[in-house]
Amino acid sequence: MNDDDKKLLGEMIKANVKKTTRKNYLIMVLAIIGIAVTVGTYPIILINLGIVKMYDYNTVPSEFFINDLKVESTDQTALPLSSWFLVKGDTLRINIVNGDEYPEKNPIVRKVIYSNQIVSNNVGIIGNNEKVYYLGWQNALETAALQETARHIPQKFQIISSEKGEGDITITFSPLRNGDGKLGSTKILVDNFRNEILKAHITVYQANEISDQTLEAIIRHELGHALGLPHAMSSRDLMNSSFSVKNAYISECDINGIVTLYNEETLHPFVCKNQT
C-alpha cells in the first residue's frame, strides 16, 4: 500500500466514524485493523484511531526538588529538610490543576488521600513481626499525630480543582515524557529560615499511558515528598527514588519519618530498618 492509499484509508475511517453508531464503529475498527495487518499498516491504524496502551510499571522512578528561592537542588543534603508549619487543625488544600481534563483520575487521588484501608504483610494470626501499611495519607498522618511533635502534623485535606494554581499542594497531569525518564516529580518551595514548606508542586508524566495502579503509586509517593519526606534508603520503601508499584504503600518507616521531620529533628539519611 502506497502513501496515497494509506491517506485514503485514514480519511475513510474519519468519515465513517461520524456516520456509525458505537457498536458499528467497533465492528468497523476490527475489520479495518484486520485489513491493516494484512497490508502491513497496523501501527498507522492504531495511531489514527487514538488507541493507547495503558502501561504497568514494576518500578517507578521519581525526582524531588527543594527550592529555597535561591537554590534549586535534588541533593537532599544540600538544603535542610522542611515541613509544613501549621496551626493545629489547619487544612492543607490539594489542587488538581487540570482535573477537568482527567476526571477518571480524580478518584485515584481521593483514594490516596482519604482511604482508611490498612494492609498487612502477614496473613492469619498477628505476630510480633507483622508490619502494617496504609493506603491513605490522612489515615497514616492521624496515626503519626498520636505522637507529640514540635510542629503540628497535617491531618486534614481538602481537594479542589482550579487552573489558577491555588492551594498548598498542586497536582498536574501531563501527557508528556520527562526528559530524565521520571514518571513523577515534586518541587517544594521552602522558607529556609524556618525550614517551612510554602508550596508543593507535583507533576505526573505520561498521564495518558500509565495504568491506574501505577498512577496510584506515583501520587502516594509524591505526596510523601509534598509533606516533606526525602527519598528513603530502603529499596523496598514507598519513598525510595525507584519504588515498587505493587508494594507502594505507606509504611511504619514513613510514619516514623514524618514524626522525626515534624519534631524538627534531622532525617539525613532516611533509613528504614527491618523493612520487609
Q: What residue ranges belong to the model's regions?
A:
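Residues that flank catalytic or metal-binding motifs in active/ligand-binding sites
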Residues: 50-52, 90, 167, 198-200, ...
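Active-site recognition of the HExxH zinc-binding catalytic motif
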Residues: 217-231
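Metzincin-family zinc-dependent endopeptidase catalytic domain
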Residues: 106-220
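Disordered inhibitory propeptide/activation segment of secreted metzincin zinc metalloprotease zymogens
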Residues: 4-17, 21-105, 111-123, 179-180, ...
